[in-house]
Structures are given as C-alpha cells and as structure tokens.
Amino acid sequence: MRSTHPKVIALFSLIAALVLALAACGGDDESGDGGGGGGGGGGDGGSASEFDFSGKEFTVGSKEFTEQLILGQITKQVLEATGAKVNDQIGLAGSVVAREALTSGEIDMYWEYTGTGWITHLGETEPIPDPEEQYTAVKDADLEKNDIEWLEPAPFNNTYAFAVREETKEELGVESISDIGGVIEENPDEATLCIGTEFSTRDDGLPGVEKSYGFEWPGDGLKKMQEGVIYQQLDDGDCNFGEVFQTDGRIQALGLALLEDDESFFPVYNPSLNVRKDVLAETPELKDLFAQVAEKLDTETMQRLNAQVDVEGLTEDEVAKTWLEDEGFLG
C-alpha cells in the first residue's frame, strides 16, 4: 500500500481544525452570550420565562394617559408571565397621585419620566440637557432622599411640545415657541391654547414656559382639558395651539406641526420603571428583566404603539400583549 505524503496529512489536519473552530463559533452565536438585553430586531429581547417570580406579588400602577396605560400593561403582563401575582392599579390620576401611591406603598412600581422626577418630584428648577446626565442625577438623588430606584431607562423621549395645524402655522407665521409672544401681543384673540390641567400648574409646564420665554398667556385664551382630548380639539380648530407629547401617534396621523423649543426649555423625559428600594431588594432580578424591556422602547416604537390605541382604536392591553409577543417576551 502506498503511504500518504506527510504534507497531505498536515493539510487534512489543518482543514479539520478549521472546520471544528468554525462549528464552535457558530454554536456560540446560536446559544447567545447570556448578557443582559441584547440588541437587534424583534424576538431578541429575551423571554419572561427566563425569570421565575412564582409566589411573589406586585402592585403595578401608571398614570391615566395612553402611553402610561400601555407601559402599565406591558409591566403587568410581563410580570404575570414570570408567574407573579399582579394587582392592577393602572390609570392613576396624574403624576402627583402616582408618585404618592408609590412612596406610600399603595403600589410597588410605575413608569416615570426623568424630567418629571427631577422637576416635579425632587423640586429642582434647572433641567439637565444631556439625557444620561439627567438620568444619573435623578436616579442618585431619588434613591438617597426617598429610597426610590430608577431602573434602566427606555431610549424614547416623551417631552412636551406645542403643536399647531399647518394652516395655522402659515397664517400666524409661527415657527417657534418664541413666536407665540408676538401673537399674544399683536393678536391676542388668536392665542388660544388647549392645555392639560396638570401642565397648567407644573414648573416644567406653562408657568415655566411663560417665565423662560417672557410672555404671559391671556387667561381667556386657555382651555383646560384632559391631554387625550387636545389633539382632536386642535385638529377641529377649537384651539390654535395645543400642548402635546412628542411620542403621541396622533401628531403624525393628524398632520400637526411642532413648534421649535428655541430656548431649550423642556427637559428630557426618558421613562424608567420606578420601584421602591425594599421591593427591588426582595426581587433584584426585576432590574435585569426590565432592562431588556426598556431597551426595546425607542421613539418610533412608542409612537407606533400609541397610534394603535389613539388612531386605530385598539385597547392598551391588546397593544401591550402583541408587542410583548413580537419581541419574544411572551411565548
């Protein structure tokens, strides 16, 4: 029998080694690295089934507007998928009520915005423009002063804005919030503003806007109502200006225009699940679970989810369930 040349044996050995190395790399990619919250598209966010909260009980709250109701449902449903019992307190009447419910122990968690925490709850007067610095500042201060934990924030920014119809923008010649001052001075009858009751009294709401921009809105031009009604009232022409949330899907659906915040008054409003320190200490895995949830909630996603409720007519629990399934959190 003719023997195989040593160089041929070496070549076969090299090929075999390469094949084994490539197979090992492929196996690592498929199994994942086990890190907290991977990037990428739908279905890569992790599964609630990876967490076992059987025997645990949580009370979940939220504020009363669409985005908050969706976030509340996402929180409730993902916790239920871990085996936890969840008491539903979703839909509390505003920031102050929700915050008091959290600090008093009536609820264990709800999503709050960094700007609201900094200005409204901590009483600071100067917002921090950089989102990461703002999050770190409110997180550290609230934990030290109030034993409230701010979990990993979502990337979307639901800051306030003033919206107008495109035709109103052209007729009144307004491009920025500063331009409103000219309308108030020269044509006060046109300075009509649909505004939420809470926004009318918040330091980061109308009082702060008036102070920062140097104008005072005529009292007879203010129409106070629930935030959810403002968009249709604005589109119907009942007001020339309206206070809106930038992530609301109705802005695009109704073709509304946003005025530039040329004084950079409005703070950053990244949402974070707020949890009392004692609750997180008992279940520290909440941090990992909701880091995976939060990273998937970018601005485009939140606008789409809001529009599914406010424009398409779906319920918040339906929207939350579908999104959690699409992202792989619910099996």
Which residues does each PLM region occupy?
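An extracytoplasmic/periplasmic, membrane-proximal ligand-sensing/linker region
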Residues: 55-56, 67, 200-204, 208-212, ...
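Bilobed "Venus flytrap"/periplasmic-binding protein-like clamshell domains
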Residues: 55-92, 156-231, 314-318
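Bacterial N-terminal signal peptides that target proteins for export
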Residues: 1-12
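Short, low-complexity, disordered segments immediately C-terminal to signal peptides
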Residues: 25-52
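Ligand-binding "clamshell"
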Residues: 121-151, 238, 250-263
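Paired acidic/hydrophobic, glycine-rich loop segments that form the ligand-binding mouth/hinge
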Residues: 108-112, 239-245
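C-terminal motif of bacterial Sec signal peptides marking the signal peptidase cleavage site
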Residues: 20-24
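A bilobed periplasmic-binding-protein/Venus flytrap-type ligand-binding module shared by bacterial periplasmic
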Residues: 160-170, 270-283
